[in-house]
Regions:
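Phosphate/dinucleotide-binding and metal-coordinating scaffold of catalytic cores
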Residues: 1-253, 257-358
Length: 358
């Protein structure tokens, strides 16, 4: 179901149809999602229009996102026609999370350059692939505000890959001197076929809206129940260490997912929402949302290694050092991506690259 930013967009979509979000129930929300949601689950009868023929205007998408996030009682869309507005609101509702984002389908040319963008919540021709666009320049009150988050997330994508973490293909999309983060969907094949996906929170029955509701130990126990092979535990261990060292405190139960194939076999999804997410004064981001060894902060090297030992991780010492080495490239890679020096230095002061020395 839509959440956070998606609910804001849904509320505005309903408003355009002279309806109130207060008068719709959870079943109504599911019929609105219909066949357009993440993963493979579909809900019938679907209550939404499909228009796959129009091209997505990123500038208009950003403008709508900024307006609906502005908390204004009356929002004017005088420069956006009614059909475009409805389409923009629709593609912004079907993906979860707090940040402004949209589901899009992209057509690339032979040089791998974007030549056309269409709605990604429905099936497009075979020469399109399916992506999530995280919109730069909209107001994200929880995880940081203003422009520039797209570039920072891209740096974190590169750091995570350096740390041996499996990520979906990602890139920066520049538009009017804004830098949006694009990541390829792992719940769709290139042909648009759907792959069943469930979050850790959904499988374990844990509400992600409850702060500090879970632990990495619980995540690994769910993996055991799903009978995942050893290499996936090692992969998830790398992700755990990366979140700690790189200050990704947005490690709640919806930010870990599992994919199921047609034979019923589960695996962990590629890592996602891997980004700097730390604010000492933040309600959600002052500490981690998942604990290790009963702690949500102030971890020791012993905590991290003991956690690995409990779940049979081989060469945990070596893996920890590899992740530290990768995160230690923050300044170098951020400089290459043109992150402002002030931003680089501010994060350098709080990254935990020196906290776990032997």
């Amino acid at each position: 179901m839509p959440d956070d930013f998606g609910n804001i967009m849904l509320k505005e979509w309903l408003k355009q149809r002279k309806l109130s979000i207060d008068k719709i129930n959870p079943v109504d929300r599911l019929t609105y999602v219909g066949s357009r949601g993440m993963g493979a689950l579909e809900y019938e009868p679907a209550d939404n229009e499909e228009n796959n023929n129009y091209n997505v205007n990123i500038s208009e998408l950003l403008e709508v996102a900024k307006r609906v996030l502005g908390d204004k009682r009356e929002i004017s869309y005088n420069n956006i026609d009614k059909d475009s507005l409805s389409d923009i609101l629709r593609i912004g509702t079907s993906v979860g999370g707090a940040r402004a984002k949209a589901l899009i389908a992209i057509k690339f040319n032979s040089d791998n350059r974007i030549i056309e963008i269409k709605p990604g919540d429905i099936i497009q021709p075979e020469d399109y692939s399916y992506w999530i666009l995280k919109i730069d320049g909209a107001n994200e009150k929880t995880l940081g505000e203003g422009e520039g988050l797209g570039k920072i997330e891209y740096v974190y994508y590169l750091l995570a890959k350096e740390a041996g973490i499996e990520m979906s293909d990602s890139r920066i999309f520049e538009e009017n001197n804004r830098f949006h983060f694009l990541t390829k969907r792992f719940d769709r094949t290139d042909k648009g076929d759907k792959i069943h996906m469930q979050t850790f929170g959904a499988i374990a029955g844990i509400d992600y809206k409850v702060q500090k509701a879970s632990s990495y130990e619980t995540l690994f126990r769910v993996m055991k129940r799903l009978r995942l092979p050893y290499y996936q535990f090692e992969q998830q261990y790398r992700r755990t260490l990366f979140n700690v060292i790189a200050r990704n405190h947005d490690d709640h139960v919806k930010n870990f997912s599992f994919l199921m194939d047609k034979e019923g076999n589960w695996k962990i999804s590629p890592a996602y929402d891997v980004n700097y997410s730390y604010s000492p004064g933040g309600t959600w981001t002052n500490v981690h949302q998942s604990s290790i060894n009963g702690k949500f902060d102030n971890f020791t090297r012993g905590d991290l290694l003991n956690f690995g030992k409990i779940f049979g991780i081989k060469k945990a010492n070596h893996i920890l050092d590899e992740v530290i080495t990768a995160v230690n490239q923050w300044s170098k890679i951020a400089t290459e991506i043109d992150i402002p020096k002030k931003e680089i230095e501010a994060r350098n002061k709080v990254l935990r690259v020196n906290n776990f020395n032997k």
